[in-house]
């Protein structure tokens, strides 16, 4: 996920090319994460890279998984 870029028609719009990195703490194993093939780690921060057009959905998913977003920073293309 690190260094993720948007492609297709979303990349043509000004918002489609914007990507943000969430710093999340407190993710825990629950019904939502039990459907995954791997366990959630129990300590420290997790970084999730999200395109602008999926920010709301990702915030909801993080909340359902028991996480708390402690920071959101834009990813600057270099």
From Swiss-Prot:
GO cellular component: phycobilisome; plasma membrane-derived thylakoid membrane
GO biological process: photosynthesis
PROSITE patterns named in the record: CPCD_LIKE
SMART domains (alphabetical): CpcD
Entry annotated with the keyword Metal-binding: no
Recorded topology in the membrane: Peripheral membrane protein
Chief localisation class: membrane
Record's keyword annotation contains Membrane: yes
Domain annotation CpcD-like: ranges: 17-75
Keywords, alphabetical: Antenna complex, Membrane, Photosynthesis, Phycobilisome, Thylakoid
InterPro entries: CpcD-like_dom
Subcellular location per the Swiss-Prot or TrEMBL entry: Cellular thylakoid membrane
Function summary: Rod linker protein, associated with phycocyanin. Linker polypeptides determine the state of aggregation and the location of the disk-shaped phycobiliprotein units within the phycobilisome and modulate their spectroscopic properties in order to mediate a directed and optimal energy transfer.
Family: Belongs to the phycobilisome linker protein family.
Name the record gives this protein: Phycobilisome 8.9 kDa linker polypeptide, phycocyanin-associated, rod
Species the sequence originates in: Thermosynechococcus vestitus (strain NIES-2133 / IAM M-273 / BP-1)
């Amino acid at each position: 996920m690190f260094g993720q870029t948007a492609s297709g028609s979303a990349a043509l719009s000004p918002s489609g090319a914007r990507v943000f990195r969430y710093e999340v703490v407190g993710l825990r194993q629950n019904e939502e994460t039990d459907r995954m093939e791997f366990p959630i780690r129990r300590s420290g921060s997790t970084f999730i890279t999200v395109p602008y057009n999926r920010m709301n959905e990702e915030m909801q998913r993080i909340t359902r998984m028991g996480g708390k977003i402690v920071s959101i920073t834009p990813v600057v293309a270099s």
